[in-house]
């Protein structure tokens, strides 16, 4: 685990402990039970990919540890509507506060604004966060293999499936990919092209790991995707689903940016 990921996970555990003390499991469970039904994140991506179009998970991200503030004029609902109008299939919303300036309210606002399924993009270290995600209305959660051992990853995935949510497994290298294929059952295998130690992106990561992916799993290419040529390069190795955030967040008109990439 990289130093920054370890720091983020330690901070997240402390934050989760604080929230659990303030909101007992019974209370967050009641909220989750009252939430609108999951919208089918994985199925939405499959429908788009099967139609021959790029299946885009468009990300709503205000800031990051490496880049700082990315989008000063940040309005989750406005961004969600622009993404939807431009043809995005799903949304990803950062809810981590300490490092990404995210918030649960951002996910709630984005999901209320459009009919698209939404991924809660956060550092999941405790099954309690899964119930919390469903209470927010999330349709999918992220499981980062670099942040969890196999048992914890499987436990969090099982909890998500119990709540009817999908899971996006995220890997960065061959070792994590092999672990994900062994300990998780989700078909969504996200390959993050960003090196967690250097923060450099390299599309060759997806090209390498694509060779490991069996027929019952689907590739989601993440990070470093900026042009249609990049998407074509990923499609050539079997990735027809893409998670893109910072590139869009830096554009004056995110809708135009999406159309330029997938239109």
UniProtKB/Swiss-Prot annotation:
Membrane among keywords: no
MF GO annotations: indole-3-glycerol-phosphate synthase activity; phosphoribosylanthranilate isomerase activity
PROSITE patterns referenced in this protein's UniProt entry, alphabetically: IGPS
UniProt keyword annotation of Transmembrane helix present: no
Any one Gene Ontology BP term: L-tryptophan biosynthetic process
EC main group: lyase
Assigned EC number: 4.1.1.48
PANTHER family referenced in this protein's UniProt entry, alphabetically: INDOLE-3-GLYCEROL-PHOSPHATE SYNTHASE, TRYPTOPHAN BIOSYNTHESIS PROTEIN
Similarity remark: Belongs to the TrpC family.
Identification of the protein by name: Indole-3-glycerol phosphate synthase
Organism, scientific name: Rhodospirillum rubrum (strain ATCC 11170 / ATH 1.1.1 / DSM 467 / LMG 4362 / NCIMB 8255 / S1)
Lineage: Bacteria, Pseudomonadati, Pseudomonadota, Alphaproteobacteria, Rhodospirillales
